[in-house]
Amino acid sequence: MPELPEVEVTRQGIAPFLVEQTVVDLVIRNGSLRWPVPDIAKQIIGQVIRQVRRRAKYLLIDTDAGTSIVHLGMSGSLRILPHDTPVEKHDHIDLVLANGRILRFNDPRRFGAWLWCELPEEAHPLLAKLGPEPLTNAFNVTQLAAALAGKKKAIKLCLMDNHIVVGVGNIYANEALFAAGIHPEAEAGKIDIERLTVLVAEVKQILAHAIKQGGTTLKDFTNADGKPGYFAQKLHVYSRGGETCTSCGNLLSEIRLGQRTTVFCGICQTR
């Protein structure tokens, strides 16, 4: 599943081709995504795209009439292509621009979404209760400590809770906890401020590095120009259960936590 770095890389890739361009058509070939795609042709045709933003794992394509809210789901991708590019399987939506290009949404598993919002996006049900962005100053040790106070849940589950901090999915939660030396099952409310300070710093550093490297190379992810990301070559624990720890040489443990595969080093990461 594309996580925050992959979505940000996509935003950076498509934004230069969309901003200040006029929409001349919206082609919906298959509107049966995670939620039905609304018929917004009348609202969006003739509109100028003002900016392309990201909130958590959602891409926001702003016009004066409203905002398209796009989620890549498990396997979705967005590509900038010439308008006459042949349609392939799973090419569900084309946003057609006056400059002869299209923004094409492809999603084999159809867990993605393309929605429309005419209200300030902060009021949309999908966005209204989201926590702070991890790469902003709003995500800091004071905020995290307050959010975790009294919580008995495993720290990894809290780190992946979008009400606490957005966009830290399974890959980067595994990696950040390893870098911070914190066991993923550690009780969140009992982690001291010093360790939380390290964790916040590692989350920021790992996400920023992943964005710089172009996102994580996984089976379904390619960035906006069709090229794979490169960060997977640098993963220390994710998907490496049973292999040796890159720090101490111990065999990495693999468990299920919150129905997600979790990999950690029982020596380097403590409760």
From Swiss-Prot:
Disulfide bonds: none
Binding site for DNA: H90, R109, K151
Cofactor binding, note field: Binds 1 zinc ion per subunit.
Zinc finger (FPG-type): 236-270
Cited function: Involved in base excision repair of DNA damaged by oxidation or by mutagenic agents. Acts as a DNA glycosylase that recognizes and removes damaged bases. Has a preference for oxidized purines, such as 7,8-dihydro-8-oxoguanine (8-oxoG). Has AP (apurinic/apyrimidinic) lyase activity and introduces nicks in the DNA strand. Cleaves the DNA backbone by beta-delta elimination to generate a single-strand break at the site of the removed base with both 3'- and 5'-phosphates.
Domain of life: Bacteria
Pfam families the record matches: Fapy_DNA_glyco, H2TH, zf-FPG_IleRS
Record family assignment: Belongs to the FPG family.
Family matches, as Gene3D superfamilies: 1.10.8.50, MutM-like, N-terminal
Cofactor: Zn(2+)
Gene Ontology molecular function: 8-oxo-7,8-dihydroguanine DNA N-glycosylase activity; class I DNA-(apurinic or apyrimidinic site) endonuclease activity; damaged DNA binding; zinc ion binding
Keywords, sorted A to Z: DNA damage, DNA repair, DNA-binding, Glycosidase, Hydrolase, Lyase, Metal-binding, Multifunctional enzyme, Zinc, Zinc-finger
Subunit structure as annotated in this protein's UniProt entry: Monomer.
Catalytic activity: Hydrolysis of DNA containing ring-opened 7-methylguanine residues, releasing 2,6-diamino-4-hydroxy-5-(N-methyl)formamidopyrimidine; 2'-deoxyribonucleotide-(2'-deoxyribose 5'-phosphate)-2'-deoxyribonucleotide-DNA = a 3'-end 2'-deoxyribonucleotide-(2,3-dehydro-2,3-deoxyribose 5'-phosphate)-DNA + a 5'-end 5'-phospho-2'-deoxyribonucleoside-DNA + H(+)
GO biological process, one term: base-excision repair
The protein's name: Formamidopyrimidine-DNA glycosylase
